[in-house]
């Protein structure tokens, strides 16, 4: 189905659907596609037939792993949607989609309210200043409570909710919503699955009597919030005049786009209720590419020189590659957001991040994993391109004669590793291909060679992340491999400063020798600092020639990678080169690199080195009767309980627990609570390992 790409950017919305893992995000997206006429049959997540979940494992596990991009039309607006995963192991997918969106719909579970993962995704959206509307889903669920969910948006997210609708009925009796702008009731008829039109039709009625007082109260709050944001409206409001519907809508739009408040709507995507008014809200309140600030970047040779690009098809071409995926027929698909200008298939563009020219092959607008070919791409839209061989996630593509480097994305380092060993020589080649393709797609998937064991190790953001990557290797790339037990990504650091550590590297063997003398001071950096390593040059009077200074820095960094105590990389160090000496003939870059490496080993041993481990923020929701067992179990895993609170019929326990103690936790939790408790965890910080535990790890690593 060929769809036109809208050139009037006022009528374009680039949005993401974001939420906790089970809030019903993919179902909501499916309904959007159904009502906007792209899907003629509804896909259900629990049937494994969902359009947006197109990878085999997504359909099996019923969770969204990669963010599929889709374009659809509502009234005469074009909505480009990215469906993002809600599982914490896939933060990279959420980060990269938020980077290129203009707005988002945050989906909440009407029974659970704001859950840990919703909080994480919300904070990521704050980081990129993405305006949002909230959709309280699953209003048909037992125990659903709209007002509780609105309270948690305030209390857990610290956000200002702007309630635009109230639910009519609850649980099985949920039939529709009160629209507080028009002060009418919207009611969906039909059975629980909707009638023949699958909830596509709803009736506008008068507000039920039992809701009239509450609706009037919430309407007043809404009008007051809108009036406060605009002096003219405030005057009108204080003068006792009614605000018109258009004025209220314009006020809500202003509050939303500036992220001062977040409109809240409700419904049940699964029961086909409330989706169309939510689409109206996307169009009415979320920004177009013209409403957001110009995208910033810097000049190719000077990071200090700030440059901007405006959403204008006639401007110089600038786009950001935000995802790379393997396609069964086309090979590598690169998803890009075009910020300014336009480009045609077959044209050359510049990858200004890498300084390489790229030729664009075919261009598509995507519908999940189906492609709609287009001849030209232009500002304000999201596309997929083929033929970009050197482009990876976070790279900028720009006009060769007017280059810019857009702000890239930063991704967290992996916290968990497994060794992977191909079964045959043929598998070795397949494994190399798989690793190359998967690491191009996913920047949080890392590969390294363990020098001691000679094994290939892959790293990721959690057990589920690595499970799925290994599963993809077997399924998509037909790799047969043995996979080891998960290993924790420990780190090392120093705790005290050491002043002026001397090291002289001297070697005299026939012909020219090697000579380098350095004096370096080391001090610890806080582990939450932006940079975990700093190098300063405080040498005066040319005692170490300028050309050798980077070699000292590289030598120190090389030694840090090899560790002090147990061979784990060292972080949190500031090194200052204070003094040194050189020889006209025998000094070289290599000699100073070796001296840098050795002075670090010497200094670090004296600087009270310690082992660090990743701590995970764990949240457990458990019925009250199992609370004691859950807390006792977390304590036995060296957990520190942070808080306990009541949340709709269950207890919520928050704790910080070392990752090394969390393997296999889900099985233990199920057996202790008869399967009634659920948990989520995400990386929090690195923390010092207790002495007794550290000694065990060090001995094991040294093979003692």
From Swiss-Prot:
Disulfide topology: none
InterPro entries the record matches: EFG_II (IPR041095), EFG_III (IPR009022), EFG_III/V (IPR035647), EFG_IV (IPR047872), EFG_V (IPR035649), EFG_V-like (IPR000640), EFTu-like_2 (IPR004161), G_TR_CS (IPR031157)
Domain tr-type G: start-end pairs: 10-290
SUPFAM superfamilies for the chain: EF-G C-terminal domain-like, P-loop containing nucleoside triphosphate hydrolases, Ribosomal protein S5 domain 2-like, Translation proteins
PROSITE patterns in alphabetical order: G_TR_1, G_TR_2
Keywords: Cytoplasm, Elongation factor, GTP-binding, Nucleotide-binding, Protein biosynthesis
GO BP terms in the entry: ribosome disassembly
Subcellular localization, as worded in the UniProt entry: Cytoplasm
One MF annotation (Gene Ontology) recorded for this entry: GTPase activity
Pfam families with a match to the protein in the record: EFG_C, EFG_III, EFG_IV, GTP_EFTU, GTP_EFTU_D2
Keyword Nuclease among UniProt keywords: no
Chain residues that bind GTP: 19-26, 83-87, 137-140
Gene Ontology, cellular component aspect: cytoplasm
Function of the molecule: Catalyzes the GTP-dependent ribosomal translocation step during translation elongation. During this step, the ribosome changes from the pre-translocational (PRE) to the post-translocational (POST) state as the newly formed A-site-bound peptidyl-tRNA and P-site-bound deacylated tRNA move to the P and E sites, respectively. Catalyzes the coordinated movement of the two tRNA molecules, the mRNA and conformational changes in the ribosome.
Family: Belongs to the TRAFAC class translation factor GTPase superfamily. Classic translation factor GTPase family. EF-G/EF-2 subfamily.
HAMAP family reported in the protein's UniProt record: EF_G_EF_2_B
Protein name as it appears in the record: Elongation factor G
Organism of provenance: Kocuria rhizophila (strain ATCC 9341 / DSM 348 / NBRC 103217 / DC2201)
Lineage: Bacteria, Bacillati, Actinomycetota, Actinomycetes, Micrococcales
């Amino acid at each position: 189905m060929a769809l036109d790409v809208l050139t009037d950017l006022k009528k374009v919305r680039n949005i993401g659907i974001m939420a906790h893992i089970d809030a019903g995000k993919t179902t909501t997206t499916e309904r959007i596609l159904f009502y906007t006429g792209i899907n003629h049959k509804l896909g259900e997540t629990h049937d494994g037939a969902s359009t947006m979940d197109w990878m085999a494992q997504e359909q099996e596990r019923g969770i969204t792993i990669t963010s599929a991009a889709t374009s659809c039309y509502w009234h005469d607006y074009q909505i480009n949607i990215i469906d993002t995963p809600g599982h914490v192991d896939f933060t990279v997918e959420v980060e990269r989609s938020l980077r290129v969106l203009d707005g988002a719909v945050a989906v909440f579970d009407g029974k659970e309210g704001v859950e840990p993962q919703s909080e994480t995704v919300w904070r990521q959206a704050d980081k990129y200043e993405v305006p949002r509307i909230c959709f309280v889903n699953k209003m048909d669920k037992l125990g659903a409570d709209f007002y509780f969910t609105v309270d948690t948006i305030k209390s857990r997210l610290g956000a200002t909710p702007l309630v635009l609708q109230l639910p009519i009925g609850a649980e099985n009796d949920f039939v529709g919503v009160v629209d507080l702008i028009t002060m009418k009731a919207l009611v969906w008829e039909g059975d629980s699955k909707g009638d023949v039109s699958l909830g596509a039709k709803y009736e506008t009625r008068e507000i039920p009597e039992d809701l009239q007082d509450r609706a009037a109260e919430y309407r007043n709050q809404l009008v007051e919030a809108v009036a406060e944001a605009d002096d003219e409206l405030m005057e009108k409001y204080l003068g006792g005049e009614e605000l018109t519907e258009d004025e209220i809508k314009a006020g809500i739009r202003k509050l939303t786009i500036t992220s001062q408040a977040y409109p809240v709507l409700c419904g049940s995507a699964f029961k086909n209720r409330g989706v169309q008014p939510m689409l109206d809200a996307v169009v009415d309140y979320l920004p177009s590419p013209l409403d957001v600030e110009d995208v910033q970047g810097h000049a190719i040779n000077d990071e200090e020189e700030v440059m901007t690009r405006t959403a204008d098809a006639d401007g110089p071409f600038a786009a950001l590659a935000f995802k790379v995926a393997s396609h069964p027929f086309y090979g590598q698909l690169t998803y890009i957001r075009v910020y300014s200008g336009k480009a045609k298939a077959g044209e050359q563009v510049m990858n200004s991040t890498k300084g390489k020219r790229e030729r664009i092959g075919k261009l598509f607008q995507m519908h999940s994993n189906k492609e709609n070919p287009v001849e030209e791409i232009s500002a304000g839209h999201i596309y997929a391109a083929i033929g970009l061989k050197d482009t990876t996630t976070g790279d900028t593509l720009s006009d060769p004669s007017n280059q810019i480097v857009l702000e890239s994305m930063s991704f967290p380092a992996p916290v968990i590793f497994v060794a992977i060993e191909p079964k045959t020589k043929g598998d070795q080649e397949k494994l190399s291909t798989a690793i190359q393709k998967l690491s191009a797609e996913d920047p949080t998937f890392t590969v390294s060679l363990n020098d001691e064991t000679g094994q290939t190790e892959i790293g990721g953001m959690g057990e589920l992340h690595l499970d799925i990557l290994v599963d993809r290797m077997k399924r998509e790339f037909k790799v047969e491999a043995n996979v080891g037990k998960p290993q924790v990504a420990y780190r090392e650091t120093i705790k005290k400063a050491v002043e002026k550590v001397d090291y002289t590297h001297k070697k005299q063997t026939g012909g020219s020798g090697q000579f380098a003398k350095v004096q370096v001071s080391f001090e610890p950096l806080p582990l939450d600092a932006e940079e975990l390593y700093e190098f300063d040059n405080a040498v005066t009077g040319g005692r170490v020639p300028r050309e050798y200074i980077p070699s000292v820095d590289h030598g120190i960094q090389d030694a840090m990678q090899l560790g002090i105590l147990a061979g784990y990389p060292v972080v949190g160090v500031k090194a200052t080169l204070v003094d040194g000496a050189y020889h006209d003939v025998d000094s070289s870059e290599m000699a100073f690199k070796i001296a840098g490496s050795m002075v670090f080993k010497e200094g670090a041993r004296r600087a009270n080195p310690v082992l660090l481990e990743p701590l995970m923020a764990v949240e457990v929701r458990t019925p009250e009767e199992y609370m004691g067992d859950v807390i006792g179990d977390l304590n036995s895993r060296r957990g520190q309980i942070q808080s306990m609170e009541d949340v709709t019929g269950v207890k919520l326990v928050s704790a910080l627990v070392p990752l090394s103690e969390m393997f296999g936790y889900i099985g233990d939790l199920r057996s202790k609570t008869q399967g009634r408790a659920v948990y989520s965890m995400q990386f929090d910080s690195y923390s010092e390992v207790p002495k007794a535990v550290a000694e065990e790890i060090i001995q094991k690593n040294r093979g003692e």
